[in-house]
């Protein structure tokens, strides 16, 4: 019976719909390896105390690569992915694999390196057009909120367009090419406009930033305008009509591209699930999923052509 289950799980991993090519594995590993060499060289040079003499069997770049491949391939069960897919099909890439329990411990130690790699090597560049939005990250079902102990004191009850939830919010800023420019994680009860008041969150943004009606705030518009950012939002039904450029009106309608990015992060990269057993595992899962999305060859994007015109349109 054990052999039959093994074959079934092995075939399930082998027939995964999101095929991972050898070139993509090599691309991810080379980027992670080059970064880890420089990062840990600086870290060891400036760290206090003695460095451990015994090094893990797997290198830092191998661990980060496996973490990213899991989300890139749209796998659902990490234990089966590591035990069967990595240990057998990718044996030539990772010849010195450790046990599953040991690998989970090593994953948590790579959070700092993965965070720095994500911000320095994986995020996109500003193109002058950016979109901002938030999406809920549920950690449990609503009927189990009082019984949840993993995120006690960390997660909070918030409300989105889909109703109430218990968990966190992922705030994203993307450009018109679908590339993630920056992100931040907050408790579920934090206002969507609050992260925009942090200059570190919007330091890569210039020119125009498009958002939905939930970001309407006169003081926020003035605050961002000082930093060279023009926040453009829709208007509510009880507000007066305003004049805006035709280009802004068209791009405001294209704001749904960031909803598509959120959908791919949740359904393809599995950024949201309720099987976390620690907060560090939750952070590791989100960072790995965002890094995997950055390696997608084709991202949601908008196509447009700018024609210079001084015409203004009435936004109705």
Task: Give the residues covered by each predicted segment.
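Short alpha-helical elements
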Residues: 1-316
């Amino acid at each position: 019976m054990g052999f039959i289950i093994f074959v079934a799980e092995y075939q399930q991993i082998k027939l995964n719909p999101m095929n991972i090519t050898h070139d993509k594995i090599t691309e991810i590993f080379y980027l992670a390896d080059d970064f880890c060499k420089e990062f840990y060289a600086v870290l060891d040079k400036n760290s206090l105390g003695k460095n451990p003499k015994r090094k893990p069997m797997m290198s830092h770049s191998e661990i980060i690569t496996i973490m990213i491949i899991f989300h890139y391939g749209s796998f659902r069960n990490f234990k089966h992915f590591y035990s069967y897919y990595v240990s057998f099909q990718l044996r030539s890439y990772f010849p010195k694999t450790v046990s599953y329990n040991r690998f989970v411990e090593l994953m948590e130690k790579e959070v700092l390196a993965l965070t720095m790699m994500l911000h320095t090597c994986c995020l996109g560049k500003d193109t002058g057009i950016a979109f901002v939005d938030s999406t809920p990250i549920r950690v449990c079902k609503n009927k189990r909120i009082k019984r949840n102990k993993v995120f006690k004191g960390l997660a909070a009850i918030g409300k989105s367009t889909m109703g109430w939830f218990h968990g966190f919010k992922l705030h994203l800023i993307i450009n018109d090419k679908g590339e993630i420019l920056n992100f931040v994680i907050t408790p579920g009860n934090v206002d969507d406009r609050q992260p925009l008041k942090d200059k570190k969150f919007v330091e890569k943004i210039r020119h125009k930033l498009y958002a939905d009606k939930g970001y309407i705030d006169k003081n926020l518009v003035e605050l961002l305008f000082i930093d060279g950012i023009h926040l453009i939002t829709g208007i509510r039904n009880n507000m007066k009509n305003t004049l805006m450029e035709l280009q802004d009106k068209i791009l405001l309608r294209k704001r749904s591209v960031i909803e598509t990015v959120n959908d791919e992060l949740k359904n393809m990269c599995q950024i949201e699930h309720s099987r976390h057993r620690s907060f560090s595992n939750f952070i590791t899962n989100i960072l790995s999923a965002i890094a995997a999305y950055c390696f997608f060859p084709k991202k949601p994007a908008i196509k447009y052509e700018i024609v210079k015109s001084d015409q203004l349109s009435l936004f109705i």
